[in-house]
Amino acid sequence: MARIAGVNIPDNKHAVISLTYIFGIGRTRSRAICAATGVAETAKIGSLSDDVLDELRGEVAKYTVEGDLRREVSMSIKRLMDLGCNRGIRHRRSLPVRGQRTKTNARTRKGPRKPIRK
């Protein structure tokens, strides 16, 4: 297994699919990375040479991925909560942020039903 950005990449899968194991890299960005390094999308990671893997590592390093991206996302949510704006308040109360209805549904975000105390 090759390690790119601190993630073990499976050897037996195509390069495009394998790169998506890195947090912050989806299919589109994975295709762009393969095109920039000249790696065929259908090439298996296990069959690539160390030089090509180093090129892939360098190309991935240009993007914000893994721990840095997770930190960036959590800090932006924390910033919204500190501001006290509507989105921050919704995050703080564990409610849907983007205008979905909450009279019914939203069970994933709100958690299991709580019984009404009498």
Curated annotation (Swiss-Prot):
Q: Which domain of life is it from?
A: Bacteria
Per its UniProt record, what NCBIfam families does this chain match?
Answer: uS13_bact
Name a single GO cellular component: small ribosomal subunit
Q: This protein is called what?
A: Small ribosomal subunit protein uS13
The record's listing under PROSITE patterns reads: RIBOSOMAL_S13_1 (PS00646), RIBOSOMAL_S13_2 (PS50159)
What is any one GO biological process for this UniProt entry?
translation
InterPro entries in the record, alphabetically? Rbsml_uS13_C, Ribosomal_uS13, Ribosomal_uS13-like_H2TH, Ribosomal_uS13_bac-type, Ribosomal_uS13_CS
Summarize the protein's role: Located at the top of the head of the 30S subunit, it contacts several helices of the 16S rRNA. In the 70S ribosome it contacts the 23S rRNA (bridge B1a) and protein L5 of the 50S subunit (bridge B1b), connecting the 2 subunits; these bridges are implicated in subunit movement. Contacts the tRNAs in the A and P-sites.
Q: Relate the assembly described in the record.
A: Part of the 30S ribosomal subunit. Forms a loose heterodimer with protein S19. Forms two bridges to the 50S subunit in the 70S ribosome.
* HAMAP family xrefs: Ribosomal_uS13 (MF_01315)
The alphabetized UniProt keywords are: Ribonucleoprotein, Ribosomal protein, RNA-binding, rRNA-binding, tRNA-binding
Please indicate if the UniProt record lists tRNA-binding as a keyword: yes
Q: Which Pfam families match?
A: Ribosomal_S13 (PF00416)
The record lists the organism as Marinomonas sp. (strain MWYL1)
Q: Which terms in the Gene Ontology molecular function aspect does this entry carry?
A: rRNA binding; structural constituent of ribosome; tRNA binding
Stretches the record annotates as Disordered:
91-118
What the entry lists under SUPFAM superfamilies is as follows: S13-like H2TH domain (SSF46946)
Q: Which family does this protein fall into? A: Belongs to the universal ribosomal protein uS13 family.
